[in-house]
Amino acid sequence: MSDTPAERALIIDDGSPCALVATLLEQAPEGITLWSMGAGDARASASRRRVALLGLAGVERIDAAMGLDDERTAGVESARLLLAAGAAAIRLGAARLVWPVALGDDLRAMGAAADRVRAVERLLDLETDPDTKPLRFDLPLLDLTLEQVADLAIDLDAPAEGAWWCEHEGAGPCGACPSCESWQRALQQARFGVAGTRAKAGA
C-alpha cells in the first residue's frame, strides 16, 4: 500500500444522481470533500449519507442562494457558483474541482459550460497567490445524457440512498416535479430502481 496521501478534490454537490456518479468515479474517496449546494434537508441528508457510505473526507454545506433555475441569469449564477467553489477548493488545499454536470443532449450548453470553466480558471489564476498551484477543473460527465449517467449508476452499483433528485422535501421523491420526471425517465430506461437495485430480467 502506498504512503502517498490521496489527492484532494472538491465535488460541487447538489445531491443529484450526477453528483453521486461523479463521486463513485473518484479513485481515492478518502481525499474527496463534497461542497453541498443542495437546497433543503433531503439533499443535504443525501450528501451526508454519501460521505458515510463511501468513506469520503467530509461535506461542506453552503447557504448561498443560487438562481440557477432562472434562465435569464443562469449563466451568471453558474459562473458565480464555480468561482465560489474554486475559492473553497483552494482554501481546502484541493488539487481539483469536480463539476458533475451532464449536458450531452445540448451541444450549446456544453460549449457554454466549458467556456465558463475556462473563464473562472483564468480569474482564479489571476487573483490567487502566484505560488499556489493552479486548480484543475474536471467535468467528467459533461458530454453524457441523463440516461447515460443512469447507465453508469448501474455499472457502478450506485447506492440510491446517496442521491436525492426531487425538488421538494419529503419521505421520498414526489414523482411529479420536473426533476423527478426527468430522472425517473432516465432511471427507468436504465433499469435503475428508486431503491438502487437493478430491475430483474423480464420485469
Name what the model sees in each region.
Residues 1-157:
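ATP-dependent adenylation/nucleotidyltransferase module used to activate substrates
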Residues 26-28, 154, 183, 191, ...:
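General N-terminal targeting signals
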Residues 162-185:
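Local cysteine-cluster metal-coordination motifs and their immediate loop/turn environment
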Residues 111, 175-176, 199-202:
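Charge-rich, low-complexity amphipathic helices
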Residues 124-128, 165-167, 193-194:
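Short, surface-exposed, polar/charged, turn-prone segments marking secondary-structure boundaries
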